């Protein structure tokens, strides 16, 4: 009788312990973006200097995992605008990340490939921070600059992606 009672008390504990699983850890990944631009009508706006061909501007990124800086997080960047070496009358544009580029303006045939207006890659430092240089040219005034970013967070085996729209004034 005592053995049956022990079995009766132990079996529920055994089944309960087999059924309880710990929840899977999901890191809290945060990406902070500082575009360092004035916001006009709800849109970050970069005023292009018409006395300069190329206008360089920096956008800052910070990656944290569970509130701590994420070192060596790998960023990829793409933009929707391109320019051509030796051609000041036209530029290239893409409507989406995977779309083909088309030309705007009086494009003279040249042998040069389109020049991107953004760096392609960057890594975060020990503070989880990095910068990306964007460099639209003066004839792009009036366009909306799209910066597509994608980050792979080292150690967390997870990534994040997003888009920043910037009005070129």
Regions found by a protein language model. Give the residues of each.
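Beta-strand-rich structural segments
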Residues: 32-37, 42-75, 79-84, 132-133
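Bacterial Sec-dependent N-terminal signal peptides
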Residues: 12-39
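Short flexible loop/turn segments that cap and initiate beta-strands
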Residues: 63-117, 162
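Short, exposed beta-strand-loop hairpins at the edges of beta-sheets
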Residues: 148-160
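Sec-dependent signal peptide recognition
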Residues: 3-10
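Glycine-centered loop-to-beta-strand initiation motif
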Residues: 124-132
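Short glycine/proline/serine/threonine-rich loop/turn segments at secondary-structure transition edges
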Residues: 138-147
